[in-house]
Amino acid sequence: MIDFDSYRESLKHLYEKLCVDDELIRIHTKTPLCFSATEWGDCFSDTNPRVLFLGKANNGAYRPKRLAVDELFDGNDLILSNGGGMKWIDDTWDCPNKCGWYPGRSPFFRVLRKMSEELCDLYHWKSSWYKYVAYGNFGKCNIDANPSPSMRIYSDRELLFAEMLNVDLKYLNPNFVICFTGSGDSTFWFSKMFLGYLDAVETDCVQWIGDNRFCIRVYHARGRYFLVSEHPQGKPEDSHVETMLKIIEKLWRTDCTK
């Protein structure tokens, strides 16, 4: 079982630092900020292996009317759900919002869902895929509707975001963390700092797609594996999923950390 109350209080303390950040307060008065927290399914804590998917930053997540931690956490806990999971992805899969966006349109969510469905088959999980996995982002705060992480926000708060993600790892305790944040020379920097924060050790680099165009970097830290790959946008999705699954299956079958 996940100790939700302790998890919540640990995160609340860190989100409060964002809410009193002078630069973020100035930004929020001109351009709305949105906040997100990691989501997990009802069956996640009892699942083996436990898989957490990570993106860079969420655009269009919860947007508070005022920048205050009590609005984020008190009452209905608008950005942290107790096992609510990602049912919303299935519920809105092909239903455009007011901006015309829907999860089925996103390569990121297509790969996430496809991989989760394959994990259900592989490990005989009996219910819907979203009950068994978790999803979050490196950056917990972003400019609303920004299509990519705001470097203005992210670069000065890397350490704080790393501390937040470390809390996620402590309470959710995933066996595998899938980082769709970039693994090439020009994109790897996004997750490099966090892997250094954990003293992670690279154990493998698996090529996928012809001519070694893309790779999945495999790291080990604190009893869990991190698979760092490219964002699915513009990449072959089926081979991406297939390569990830082969890595997970091999490590889960042979590694004593399970």
Language-model features: locations:
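C-terminal capping/extension of enzyme domains
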Residues: 1-11, 16, 151-166, 185-258
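A polyanion-binding, active-site-adjacent surface
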Residues: 2-172, 176, 182, 186-188
